[in-house]
Amino acid sequence: MTGRQQWCDGVLAGPGGAMTDEVGVITGPLTVRTTAVPGGRVRIEIQYEDAEEWYTLTGSPVPDRGDPAAVHAAALAAVRTGHEAGAPGGAAPA
């Protein structure tokens, strides 16, 4: 892999928050981290702002479709929208 491999930005979760595999829905000020991984996929993780523990955004990892930065932007948009947001292009929450 070449170029940038990780993106990390703060976001305020919309109503209904974001769905994680480990703890369910989280809300409020969050940080989203997207990391390119081998095989043309990206892993999307989320944490409470300034926390230490990261959680997997439900549906992650997802295909990067050749533009992992766009997947990161889509993940931020999904979390801003809320409604138990999961990874863009990933599995829907149960």
Residue ranges and their predicted role:
Residues 34, 42, 46, 75-79, ...:
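Amphipathic alpha-helical interface segments used for dimerization/assembly
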Residues 1-33:
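Negatively charged, low-complexity tracts enriched in Asp/Glu with abundant Ser/Thr
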Residues 38-55:
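A short, structured beta-strand/loop element
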Residues 27, 46, 70-73:
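A ubiquitous, low-specificity "background" feature that marks scattered single residues
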Residues 27, 55-58:
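Generic, ordered loop/turn and secondary-structure boundary motif
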Residues 53, 61-94:
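Mixed-charge, Lys/Arg-enriched low-complexity segments
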